[in-house]
Amino acid sequence: MIDMLVLRLPFIDSLVCSRLSGNDLIAFVDLSKIATLSGMNLSARTVEYHIDGDLTVSGLSHPFESLPTHYSGIAFKIYEGSKNFYPCVEIKASPAKVLQGHNVFGTTDLALCSEALLLNFANSLPCLYDLLDVNATTISRIDATFSARAPNENIAKQVIDHLRNVSNGQTKSTRSQNWESTVTWNETSRHRTLVAYLKHVELQHQIQQLSSKPSAKMTSYQKEQLKVLSNPDLLEFASGLVRFEARIETRYLKSFGLPLNLFDAIRFASDYNSQGKDLIFDLWSFSFSELFKAFEGDSMNIYDDSAVLDAIQSKHFTITPSGKTSFAKASRYFGFYRRLVNEGYDSVALTMPRNSFWRYVSALVECGIPKSQLMNLSTCNNVVPLVRFINVDFSSQRPDWYNEPVLKIA
């Protein structure tokens, strides 16, 4: 699916001026004039107040703002113009979220995704929209996302852990950008950045963030989004999903042969897809091809202790003052259980204070795990090919109840 689309709409020629900067001819617009014509608010780096009451403003700029839609927001920013940036308005959003309120799955239709951004933008800011040469709109970035499905969240987490050490050729893991449920490769690349993450974890985090807001302070689209995200069928479909996201910049799009002009790209996509192919899936495959070669022949040791984890969490949890459920203690007990599996009962007993060891053993026994079982745990020799869990089935990216979204204008 198209998970992010970034478009740049240049200003009409009559508003664009030019100036020399060294040997470079810089195109720019007068932001104060744009603000007057469009009614937009600007920020100023410096404001000087004179004793006669006059104000002198300099360093005008436009910060990113968010336009509300039915389900989500569209970010936009006015760029004055610089050596490497033609004066334009940049708009960016997740078309999936704009169209349906979530990005667990979604469409690969470039025309529909572009329409969702452009029509909502035109409807919200018609005066600014009229100042732009819409036919010259260019694509700045496309995020193409597809998912592999692990048997459960426990195994999906192990896949992410294993991927942290995978790289190939010019595709390097960016360790500073890795979190517990996310791995990033080539984070600073001007060509493409690759990301793998657990969708169910992200979805739960989004629900938690929205639920924590007082109802009176929630926008209408946030309320709609929370309603969509809380769908039990959606949560069930997201469970076990390992997402592979390619954030594709203009240089990489050009190397694939995709025109950067939006409307040329839409025609290109239509012709491409008419041949029984899918442009977005092939762009995604092209982006991940180097990394996926590293998966060939690689294997990982998989353990599935989800039933044990469920038993521990059902017994050892606390309710925080804010009313949330904390499984911090359960996580420590499960970590101890994994040590018993990997190192053996006697070995762990020798390396822990006696009182702590027996306290942890007693906690596991309380969960219904017999002590005799704890004394005879061993790592199962369950080494499986990594590609078994990185099998991205294009035909099963959406549930059977999926319908292509219909555009709604806020």
Curated annotation (Swiss-Prot):
Lineage: Viruses, Monodnaviria, Loebvirae, Hofneiviricota, Faserviricetes
Family of this protein: Belongs to the inovirus G2P protein family.
Role according to the record: Isoform G2P plays an essential role in viral DNA replication. Binds the origin of replication and cleaves the dsDNA replicative form I (RFI) and becomes covalently bound to it via phosphotyrosine bond, generating the dsDNA replicative form II (RFII). In turn, viral DNA replication initiates at the 3'-OH of the cleavage site. After one round of rolling circle synthesis, protein G2P is linked to the newly synthesized ssDNA and joins the ends of the displaced strand to generate a circular single-stranded molecule ready to be packed into a virion.
Short name of one Pfam family: Phage_CRI
Domain of life per record: Viruses
Gene Ontology biological-process annotations: DNA replication; rolling circle single-stranded viral DNA replication
Catalytic activity, reaction form: ATP + (deoxyribonucleotide)n-3'-hydroxyl + 5'-phospho-(deoxyribonucleotide)m = (deoxyribonucleotide)n+m + AMP + diphosphate
UniProt KW keywords: DNA replication, DNA-binding, Endonuclease, Formylation, Hydrolase, Ligase, Nuclease
GO molecular function: DNA binding; DNA ligase (ATP) activity; endonuclease activity
InterPro entries from the UniProt entry: G2P, G2P_C, G2P_N
EC number, UniProt record: 3.1.21.-, 6.5.1.1
Keyword Repeat: no
Protein name: Replication-associated protein G2P
